[in-house]
A protein has these predicted regions:
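ATP/NTP phosphate-donor binding region
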Residues: 1-94
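Structural motif
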Residues: 18, 40-41, 93-96, 135-140, ...
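Short glycine-/acidic-enriched loop or helix-start segments at secondary-structure transitions
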Residues: 51-54, 106-108, 148-149
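Short, hinge-like loop/turn segments at secondary-structure boundaries
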Residues: 59, 83, 113, 153-156
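N-terminal loops that bind phosphate or other acidic moieties
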Residues: 63, 110, 170
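Acidic-aromatic/histidine active-site loop/patch
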Residues: 101
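DPxDG-like acidic metal-binding loop motif
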Residues: 105-118
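A glycine/threonine-rich phosphate-anchoring loop and its flanking beta-alpha core
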Residues: 115-185
Length: 185
């Protein structure tokens, strides 16, 4: 790092994400959603379905279980979730991603694509899809990816693996529960 920083006249970073640290992450997330009168749509890593700590979330009607074991989310996954969300009678105002980096990236991309017409692969790149979509909230279950604060959603598209990169892709809220990230789940 010293070599990199020695060539920079300044170094600044900004994180637009509100970070909430709680040992009761799931409860804190649900309480906050209720308190703010949000209509959430949950994107949850399917590996979490058998863990009792997530039972209150899995009872939600607006839920998409994502199999994150394969690889990064695909642009087709984003299009599927957007279609599900738009076909319902509810207007969802927040997409909640719960899981590892791939699941959070899927939720982030869905949040952007809800407000921008066309397929998700059209927004892979920098500064595309600049209409702000639904709020994006995340609850990571794996530490180290950084997806909970970054303005990038990495997707595997029909022709390339590339991120959706714009200021609205960063989650507005991240609930960090150290108990959920203490081991790979």
């Amino acid at each position: 790092m010293e070599g990199f920083l020695s060539h920079q006249p300044w170094w600044r970073t900004g994180v637009p994400t509100e970070i909430i640290r709680s040992r009761e992450g799931v409860g804190e997330l649900l309480h906050r959603l209720e308190r703010e009168k949000k209509n959430p749509f949950f994107v949850v890593d399917s590996v979490l379905r058998d863990q009792s700590v997530f039972s209150p979330l899995l009872g939600q009607k607006a839920l998409y279980l994502f199999d994150a074991s394969a690889s990064e989310p695909k642009t087709g996954d984003v299009d599927t979730v957007v279609s599900i969300m738009k076909s319902g009678s509810k207007a969802y105002d927040v997409v909640v991603g719960i899981g590892g980096g791939g699941t959070m990236d899927l939720a982030k991309a869905v949040g952007i694509c809800l407000a921008n017409p066309g397929p998700a692969h059209a927004y892979q790149g920098y500064g595309l899809g600049m209409n702000k979509g639904a709020d994006i909230w995340v609850l990571p279950t794996l530490s180290g990816t950084g997806a909970e604060i970054t303005p990038i959603a990495v997707l595997r598209g029909p022709e390339k693996k590339l991120g959706i990169n714009n200021p609205y892709t960063a989650p507005s809220v991240a609930v960090i529960d150290p108990g959920l990230t203490s081991g790979v789940r």
